[in-house]
Amino acid sequence: MSRVSQARNLGKYFLLIDNMLVVLGFFVVFPLISIRFVDQMGWAAVMVGIALGLRQFIQQGLGIFGGAIADRFGAKPMIVTGMLMRAAGFATMGIAHEPWLLWFSCFLSGLGGTLFDPPRSALVVKLIRPEQRGRFFSLLMMQDSAGAVIGALLGSWLLQYDFRLVCATGAILFILCALFNAWLLPAWKLSTVRTPVREGMRRVMSDKRFVTYVLTLAGYYMLAVQVMLMLPIMVNDIAGSPAAVKWMYAIEACLSLTLLYPIARWSEKRFRLEHRLMAGLLVMSLSMIPIGMVGNLQQLFTLICAFYIGSVIAEPARETLSASLADARARGSYMGFSRLGLAIGGAIGYIGGGWLFDMGKALAQPELPWMMLGIIGFITFLALGWQFSHKRTPRRMLEPGA
């Protein structure tokens, strides 16, 4: 086995272990933020939505800067620094009793993510061969789902005692992850050339096809982020207990572990990437619309199942399509900019979703936020269809598994 092949194989295992630690640390804390501050402390949902939206926008909106810096200086220092900064954010969150302190903790957490997320994504593109990326992204998503359940279960159990224990556990996991990267991650360069920061950013911004694709995904993310805000609140409201939230993530884990990899393997040779993304988005949009009209957990969990199935179809295709469009000369910059859609969509989804949720309650129209999200999903579906029409899209992008 050549040294390059050996490095790729070892790199896969490193990425999987690193991803599990990050997912556990994140999901111990974030799914419980809305439960803690809305249900237990009585804050308005929009106040928590601002905090979550701020974290999302800082982490993803500034991702191009984190990616460009990583292109220049390498992945390791950015990843280690970012993970320690997120740990500090979680520690601050544990003592948050005023909105401004929660916002500050989410700012720190998001800034840490800005530093470590783009270089981690670029390492996947660097180490995984193009023909294997779709399946590897599916494996990462399966890990995400399993880690989400384990993290949510652990966080829910700790929340019975003290929210500070929840935040301390998340902080410790990110400190362990920082030490893991500091010890084992080689000083790899992300790009094929040592790209100056401004050059990497210029290369991305001049790629109109990539920019259009990323901005279009903002609508997709407005729906996707509700698993952190409105869906947990809805489950808690109907069940009457935050303990039921863990079953929401258990559903996601079961569906992901059983369907993600088989669907990715089956569809990658039969359907184009953008068609898989659009099909998943359509299922997600259709499942959102009736949520505000359900009256029991069985109906709600059925719709959540449909939503997660749409995500299972869409997510591997979205990640693979983003990676396939990245220029190898500026991988970090491209993967950083690819998060801008999540920054915009996530911020609007959190803040707007929280505002609409409060408004729906005030007007006695609980279906209002869910109907709006469904409409946004349909508009995004049409926009993607227009962008990837045969007349507009180069043939190479449209091939299955491209």
UniProtKB/Swiss-Prot annotation:
Protein localization: Cell inner membrane
Record-given protein name: Multidrug resistance protein MdtH
Bridged cysteine pairs (disulfide): none
Main location: membrane
Source organism superkingdom: Bacteria
Cytoplasmic compartment residues: 1-12, 117-138, 186-213, 265-276, 321-339, 389-402
Membrane-protein topology: Multi-pass membrane protein
Family as reported in the entry's similarity comment: Belongs to the major facilitator superfamily. DHA1 family. MdtH (TC 2.A.1.2.21) subfamily.
Gene that this sequence comes from: mdtH
Pfam families from the UniProt entry: MFS_1
Record-annotated membrane-spanning stretches: 13-33, 99-116, 139-159, 165-185, 214-234, 244-264, 277-297, 300-320, 340-360, 368-388
Periplasmic face of the membrane: 34-98, 160-164, 235-243, 298-299, 361-367
GO cellular component, as recorded: plasma membrane
Record keywords, A-Z: Cell inner membrane, Cell membrane, Membrane, Transmembrane, Transmembrane helix, Transport
Single GO term (MF): transmembrane transporter activity
